[in-house]
Design a protein with these regions (language model features):
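Short, contiguous alpha-helical
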Residues: 58-108, 150, 154-202
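Amphipathic alpha-helical packing segments from all-alpha helical-bundle domains
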Residues: 137-151
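N-terminal targeting signals for Sec/Tat export/insertion, comprising classic cleavable signal peptides
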Residues: 31-59, 184
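Short, helix-capping/interhelical loops that line the mouth of catalytic, cofactor-
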Residues: 21-33, 84-141, 167, 196-202
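DHp/HisKA dimerization-phosphoacceptor four-helix bundle of two-component histidine kinases
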Residues: 36, 40, 73, 77, ...
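Bacterial N-terminal signal peptides that target proteins for export
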Residues: 1-11
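Second-shell loop/turn segments in exported
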Residues: 28-35, 56-62, 67-73, 127-138, ...
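Bacterial N-terminal signal peptides
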Residues: 9-20
C-alpha cells in the first residue's frame, strides 16, 4: 500500500522538480539593481526624518496635504500590501511569454523621481493616521525593507517570467523595483515639505 502511494506521488514530485530546475533565477545585474535601490531608499528615508521635532513631523503646507509623519505612515500601511501582492503573483504560473510589459525599466525608475503629476491615494492606503508615533512606523517600515532585501539576496524566483497586474501588466521584477521607487517618490514629497518656506525651523 505504501509502495503504491509512493508510485502515484512520484510523477508529481518529478514534475515539481523539473519546473523548479527550468525556472531561471534573476540575473546578477537584476538582483544587484534591486538590492542597491532598496538599500538606497531605506537610507534616504532614515536621513530625511532623522532629528525632526514633533512640530516638523506634523507640519502641513496646507490642510489637504500630508505631513512628514503621514508620508512615512503611508509607506508602512501600503508597502506590506504591495509585498503580499508580489508574493502572490510570483506563485502563479509564469506568463510573461504571452504578454508585453506596458512600462520599461526606465519608466519605473522615473516614477520615483517625477512628481509633476500627483495621483490620489486609495485602496485603504490613504489611512495615514494608522501610526501616530514615528519610531513605531519606522520600525515597521524597516522590518519589511529588511525582509524584502533578504528575499532579493537569496531568491531563485524568475521575476521577469511572471506578470503583475491584469489591465496594464508589468513583470514582477519591475513591480519589486516600483515598491522601492514608491518609497523614493514619498521621500521626494518629504523634501518638498521641508523646503516649504513656512516649515518650522525646529
Amino acid at each position: 500500500m505504501h509502495i503504491m502511494r509512493t508510485i502515484r506521488v512520484l510523477p508529481f514530485l518529478v514534475l515539481a522538480m523539473t519546473l523548479r530546475l527550468c525556472a531561471a533565477p534573476m540575473t546578477d545585474e537584476d538582483r544587484e539593481h534591486l538590492r542597491v535601490h532598496f538599500e538606497m531608499t531605506g537610507h534616504m528615508l532614515a536621513e530625511e526624518v532623522r532629528g525632526l521635532s514633533p512640530a516638523q513631523l506634523e507640519y502641513k503646507a496646507s490642510p489637504d496635504r500630508w505631513s512628514i509623519r503621514e508620508c512615512v505612515s503611508h509607506l508602512a500601511v501600503a508597502e506590506p500590501d504591495y509585498w503580499r501582492d508580489l508574493q502572490k503573483a510570483v506563485k502563479a504560473p509564469p506568463d510573461m511569454k504571452d504578454k508585453k510589459s506596458v512600462a520599461t525599466d526606465a519608466d519605473i525608475m522615473w516614477y520615483g523621481i517625477d512628481r509633476v503629476v500627483h495621483t490620489k491615494t486609495g485602496g485603504g492606503h490613504e489611512k495615514v493616521d494608522t501610526y501616530k508615533n514615528l519610531g513605531e512606523v519606522r520600525a515597521k517600515f524597516e522590518a519589511l525593507h529588511a525582509t524584502v532585501i533578504a528575499y532579493i539576496n537569496t531568491t531563485n524566483d524568475d521575476l521577469r517570467a511572471h506578470s503583475f497586474g491584469d489591465q496594464a501588466p508589468i513583470d514582477c521584477w519591475q513591480w519589486m523595483l516600483e515598491i522601492s521607487t514608491h518609497t523614493e517618490r514619498h521621500i521626494q514629497q518629504i523634501r518638498e515639505i521641508k523646503a516649504d518656506p513656512n516649515f518650522p525651523k525646529k
